[in-house]
Amino acid sequence: MYTLIKTEGKARRGQFETVHGTFQTPCFMNVGTAAAIKGGISSIDLKNDLKCQVELCNTYHLHVRPGDKVIKQMGGLHKFMNWDKPILTDSGGFQVFSLAKLRKIKEEGVCFNSHVDGRKIFMGPEESMQIQSNLGSTIAMAFDECIDNHMAQITPDMDEKAKNRIIRKAYDYSKNSCDRTVRWLYRCKEEMARLNSLPDTINKHQLLFGINQGSVFDDLRLRHMEEIAKLDMDGYAVGGLAGEPTEEMYHILDILCPVMP
């Protein structure tokens, strides 16, 4: 449960209560991709010296190795890591979609090859939720497509006709992707509810956050936020802002923050 403590202009300070403890917002999430911080930092150091409130772990990498089922057998990520504070797991979507030459997108999900051993893996909304449930994280992220920034193909010396062609193609792709991501979110929510009701689920109070997409197109971003807000998720994130120019990132945040739940 989120509690708003104070606001100042567009900024707000609050706290988020979870089954694994409370963290203050805004907060910095330390990244432990494979359930550990690089550099030999122990969980004790992370808590006592670095004052880490939330650790972020990577669903895709943990699924590939050591395997989410192995981690479940060990009691979940908290026991695996010797960590008793909140953990957020991403959906694996960003990593999957970054494997551009190794994956194929379908309505059901994504087929791709492991970057480790080349084996074929299928991941869709249900599979992502199942993996994250096996990990037992505090907060799970919905499976979405992290859309490539096709606008980066535009160069200063390009003529207007070529620019418009790229923009139109990027817009159409982004729109179709957003629509699919909404459908995937419905499937994620349904599967998470099912998993949280099972007797052998590690964290029966696992939270699920929806992710806003829409590339750099204002109308797509706003429409997508409106659609996913209807599902009344436990929280929301702004996705796909990785690699865009800083001014575009700030612009997207400026138009989205006032309308986010």
Predicted segments with their positions:
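Glycine-rich phosphate/ribose-binding loops and adjacent secondary-structure elements
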Residues: 179, 191, 195, 203, ...
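Non-catalytic, usually N-terminal nucleic-acid engagement modules in DNA/RNA processing proteins
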Residues: 1-201
